Amino acid sequence: MKIKIILLSIILVLLPTSIFAQKQDASAVVQSFYKFHLSRSGIFNASEVNARKKWFTDDLNKLFQTELQREKEYLKANPTDKPHFGDGFPFQPFDECESAGKLIKNTYQVGAATVKGEKATVEVKFYQPKECGGDLIDTYKVELVKSNGKWLINDWLYSDAKTLTEDLKRTNY
């Protein structure tokens, strides 16, 4: 009987810790992704998609590969037009402000994860730099799924209730 009580006590102590670790891990993945993403070119091309693929689910990676092919075909037929992701990856609002003739990037804040089983949602808030007012620009939600014990990004939910995967699956280029 004492052993059962001790084991139950250990389980009750460790359970909240493991739940916290899951939340922390999902947020840490998003934080790591944005740190990497913002350290590189935001240009949407095969090299940059491949550089980010370790953070994405297989499904999201496939959608990006399909988009690259669609873009290639579109540009072949319309060489002077801007492609759909011609302004770069849609992982953040258009950023930068100008202060004293210098272009200054926006800042971001990664929130805590909301975990439900094998899915997590992490809120990311984007702010103007302090030099440009520091106001909140937009909030995105990053959806993650657990695959082989690892959190992977599966989608972005934008403030207008549209998602990245919906955009990538659009019928018309």
Write out the residue ranges for each language-model feature.
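Amphipathic alpha-helical surface "interface" segments used
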Residues: 49-63
